[in-house]
């Protein structure tokens, strides 16, 4: 929207003696109703805004007269003229643009959109003007004046406790000039402000509560362990009481038998049946034990027989091995004896030949001496194989002794 044309239109409206509606200014009000942006300052378009508001209220009354029925008992009835003067007085008292300017422009440009009755329309306007906060136009934001304004109150320009943003329609809480900067090391809460002493105290209280809770939990755990111990002791005591009760049951049964003979006879019959069942079970247990012992003995006998058979087989194998070794040694001895016998026979032939040659010249006594020597040699030959055979028979007996 062209600001220069708007300012010229506002100046022309102020210069006119007879106030009339301006299409350019109506377009400005429609722009504010749609966007909420006031291009010019409040004092510049304040006069036209009041004129337009008064005209709309009058038109609304002529087109929609006051209700003829009884008024609402929950609402105070105020005449139209009085309500109109009250509204105009509040609006003319503004020194800044109220922050409800967009809604007020909507009511001025299209008054019958939400209201049909005059009294309701006036109450809607009154509700929107009963404010003190202000809004800035775009030009006022860029070129703010040195005056700190509120609607109804003016502050000097050298005031340091208020800024230009403290532009409210009435007394309010101004903002400080400069916000203090806090270091990052200081603790910050969720709103970006440092934690106060109250927050610190609350943190300390929470820590103390957590410590106390942990101590309580430890005490609870100790209590549970002690309860478990007590429960175990109680169970042991209960078992002891049951054992004692079982011991004292026979005495009680005897007393009951003396008191009630019929009951005692029944109890004795039951005891006899239990004894018979116990004896039968004992007999069955004995039979099972005997069968188990017999099976164990049979298994032991079979194991001993198998070990004896294995030992006999091992002995027979050892005997066969020794016999084979003795036979081999006997054959070796026989071969050696045959070789020695052959050598001896050859020697004898040589000696006999020499003897025959010598006997021809020798005496008969020498012949006898040779005959006796030859007989002795033959005896020694016959004895030597016998000794070898005895040694061979003695040799296999040694491994038997070792086994």
Curated annotation (Swiss-Prot):
Comp. bias regions, Basic and acidic residues: 197-211
Signal sequence region: none
Biased segments, Acidic residues type: 388-403
A Pfam family that the UniProt record links to this protein: PPP4R2
Biased composition (Polar residues): 140-149, 156-170, 183-196, 212-226, 371-387
GO molecular function: protein phosphatase regulator activity
Spans annotated as Disordered: 140-403
Gene Ontology cellular component list: cytoplasm; nucleus; protein phosphatase 4 complex
Quaternary context: Serine/threonine-protein phosphatase 4 (PP4) occurs in different assemblies of the catalytic and one or more regulatory subunits.
Record's function text: Regulatory subunit of serine/threonine-protein phosphatase 4 (PP4).
Family: Belongs to the PPP4R2 family.
Name of the featured protein: Serine/threonine-protein phosphatase 4 regulatory subunit 2-A
Protein source organism: Xenopus laevis
